[in-house]
Amino acid sequence: MAFTEPEVPELNGSTKGKYLCLTICGYRKPGMSEEDYRHHMVNISAPMTKGLMVKYGVKRWTQIHNQSSTRALMSHLFDSQMAIVADFDCFSQVVFKDIEHYKRMKQDPWYQEHLIGDHEKFADTRRSMMTIGWIEEFVRDGEVVEGFKDS
C-alpha cells in the first residue's frame, strides 16, 4: 500500500518571515531510566543529528528533559488555572522555515540508515506525540521583541 500525503488546508494569514516549530512530546522506552534516556538523547542522538539538521535548514533544535526532579518543581507553580503536569519525558523542538526542508532531511539516506534505528533504542515511538505550529515570539534574551528573529 502506497503512502499518499494528506490534503492540507490553506494557511490562514501571512507566513512571511515566520518559522514553524515541530514539537515532539516524547516518552522514553519502557524500562529505561530517566538518566539513561537523557544521556542517550544528549550524548548519542544529538551529535548524530545536529549536522544533518543544519544541512537541511533547521534554524534551532532544543530538547527539554522533564525528569521527576524538575516535574516536582511544578508544585511551586500550581494555581487554579495550572494544576495538571504533563507526564512526557522530553519535549524536542525543531524550528525551520519550510516543511519541505524537514521532509527532505527525513528522506536523506544517512537519516534513513542511522537515525530511524537510533530512535528505537531510546524512544517509545508508539506513545510519543507531535504537533507543529507557527512561532510567535514576544520576549528574547530579556528584551521585548516583535516576532521570531529571521537572521
UniProtKB/Swiss-Prot annotation:
Q: What is its EC number?
A: 1.-.-.-
Q: Which GO terms describe its molecular function?
A: monooxygenase activity
The keyword Secreted belongs to this UniProt entry's keyword annotation: no
Q: What is this protein called?
A: Probable decarboxylase notQ
Its taxonomic path starts at: Eukaryota, Fungi, Dikarya, Ascomycota, Pezizomycotina
Use in biotech reads:
Notoamides have been shown to exhibit antitumoral activities. Notoamides A-C show moderate cytotoxicity against HeLa and L1210 cells with IC(50) values in the range of 22-52 mg/ml, but the IC(50) value of notoamide D is greater than 100 mg/ml. Moreover, notoamide C induces G2/M-cell cycle arrest at a concentration of 6.3 mg/ml.
What region holds the EthD domain? Answer: 30-125
- Database matches in Gene3D superfamilies: 3.30.70.100
Would you identify the family this protein belongs to, as annotated? Belongs to the tpcK family.
What organism is the protein native to?
A: Aspergillus sp. (strain MF297-2)
Asked if the keyword Oxidoreductase belongs to this entry, the reply reads yes
The UniProt keywords, alphabetically, are: Monooxygenase, Oxidoreductase
Q: Function, please?
A: Probable decarboxylase; part of the gene cluster that mediates the biosynthesis of notoamide, a fungal indole alkaloid that belongs to a family of natural products containing a characteristic bicyclo[2.2.2]diazaoctane core. The first step of notoamide biosynthesis involves coupling of L-proline and L-tryptophan by the bimodular NRPS notE, to produce cyclo-L-tryptophan-L-proline called brevianamide F.
Top-level lineage group: Eukaryota
